[in-house]
Amino acid sequence: MPVNEEDLKTYRRDLHKIPELALAEFKTHRYLLEKIQSWQTNFMTIRQVEELPTAMLVKFSGTDPSRTVGYRADIDALPVTEDTGLPFESTHKGVMHACGHDVHMSLALGLVQYFSEHQPKDNLIVFFQPAEESKSGGKLAVDLGIFEGEWHPDEFYGIHDQPNLPAGTLSTLAGTLFAGTAELEIDIHGQGGHAAYPHLGKDPIVISAELIMLLQTVVSRDVDPIEGGVVSLGMISGGFTNNVIPDTVHLAGTVRSMTKDGLDKMTTRIRQIVEGVALANDVKINVRLETGSYLPVENNPDLANNLLSFMEQRQDIAFEEAKPAMTGEDFGYILQHIPGVMLWLGVNDNHSLHSAKLNIDEAALLPGFNALKDFIEWRMSQGE
């Protein structure tokens, strides 16, 4: 039986009901495993990973393989309380598939279902990856050696849903699609006291204001305007009443760049600014910058151009060339080790990714699946 829209909608809705946070996707894993086991064939191997227990890989041995093609779908959700009113909304309080990973999984299940009935020409590995949102599951998988030996894809593909695109429209580019990110935390240790006697202490609130303004010069004065970048502080915490200077202020934010070199330059400059402000104010400032897991998603130019060629040939597939986005995705870490391409899939919603009201248009599922399946078969028909 061919994979149809109702199949994909069922998978998506079932998974939407049971969202789970990074590395705790046990119900999700069980659901995926039960579905996949129901399609078991003699040319399919299901692999579970002891060190990463919610991960799963499904390998189809090809009829005449000259390569191994990989497809990755992330499976975790976000700590968001859903506010959609859908009949299949989250049954897990405070957790929601607000980034569309239910969509990603439904497409991957569709691939497994289809290729269990149509043995591919080349080897195919479908990777269900935990912990994209916060625990760097892509890095964990690579560092554990999951993709070594017979489980090594020669090329990797992935899809991410995009509310700003029409339902079913695919989009990518030959180059960097998503930014690399670094998470920033700063703790300013001043000396608190009575607000009427600021000269007797060291006011971390005033120092934080100075630091916040200086950090905004990193992009405007240290980054090539053609390359771009982002330094955004989304959290400031300090003090507990109006007439007491606190001892500490905590800042947190994100740093983003379209290149690894750009990200390295920005984080170095941030550290220099923090050190300078600490010295100028005679206080201690601790800075933490987490980098290395959410690298830029750099599409391999040859593979991306090959995919673009396929899209040009298929007038029945809605496609538009993408612009680079400041979105972060740990698929970038995988692509540092295995060449590949990530695409957007339009899901047509007025609410953004990570919104409690995100409600994707399920009309995107079948065209997204068909385009993905057809591309994989076309790619395999090309030979080496």
UniProtKB/Swiss-Prot annotation:
GO biological process: diaminopimelate biosynthetic process; lysine biosynthetic process via diaminopimelate
Catalytic-site annotation from UniProt: D74, E133 (proton acceptor)
Superkingdom field: Bacteria
Keyword flag rRNA processing: no
Record InterPro entries: AcetylDAP_deacetylase (IPR023905), Amidohydrolase (IPR017439), Bact_exopeptidase_dim_dom (IPR036264), Peptidase_M20 (IPR002933), Peptidase_M20_dimer (IPR011650)
Keywords in alphabetical order: Amino-acid biosynthesis, Diaminopimelate biosynthesis, Hydrolase, Lysine biosynthesis
UniProt pathway: Amino-acid biosynthesis; L-lysine biosynthesis via DAP pathway; LL-2,6-diaminopimelate from (S)-tetrahydrodipicolinate (acetylase route): step 3/3
Annotated GO MF terms: N-acetyldiaminopimelate deacetylase activity
EC number: 3.5.1.47
HAMAP family hit by this protein: DapEL (MF_01692)
UniProt record similarity statement: Belongs to the peptidase M20A family. N-acetyldiaminopimelate deacetylase subfamily.
Protein's name according to its UniProt entry: N-acetyldiaminopimelate deacetylase
